[in-house]
Amino acid sequence: MSQLTIDGDNDGTAAPLIPERPTLKKLREAAAGCKACPLWQTGTQTVFGEGSAKADVVFVGEQPGDQEDLEGRPFVGPAGKLLDQALEEAGIDREQVYVTNVVKHFKWKSQGKRRIHQKPNWKEIGACRPWLDAEVAVLKPRVLVCLGATAAQALLGRDFRVSRQRGELVESPLAEKTIATVHPSSILRAEDRDVQFEEFVRDLRKIAALI
């Protein structure tokens, strides 16, 4: 399969890269060479979704972070560790879920020796969206969970507000049940971290009750 190379001045989409009769393995291999948006130039590698191929629940975040970019795996940094802890407290087996992001490359800016996260724009989200759609189509999850505003607005509409609608069941073609909550990275930044963590666990317990 040829790689799609599109520079940052053009509207790109990963759609031509989606393999026929996709499987997670085929999708991961194809995504490794994606150049549908300029983020491939600054990201270390594509960070594709990971988890059980029979997952009832799919968690969707915004994009990989610094550690995820270096390791090539989603949710392995501080936010991922917090998610793991919350899943355990909510009674959800981490090995039985699937985690991914709406954007598969790390967008960042340099600040001294650190790489600081930058929010992807709508063009970048749109270019990468076919990968997520294909993942969900293969997995056919019972529950899809949007983690944070970027994922929620990308999948449920730009008017969606996690601050008002977190924990609500939302109709969507993505899964039998779709729900949004905060991204675990926001809990790490919160002054009342313990309170926010408990609220996050409560949201996850609602999800546990759906499966």
Regions found by a protein language model. Give the residues of each.
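A polyanion-binding, active-site-adjacent surface
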Residues: 2-211
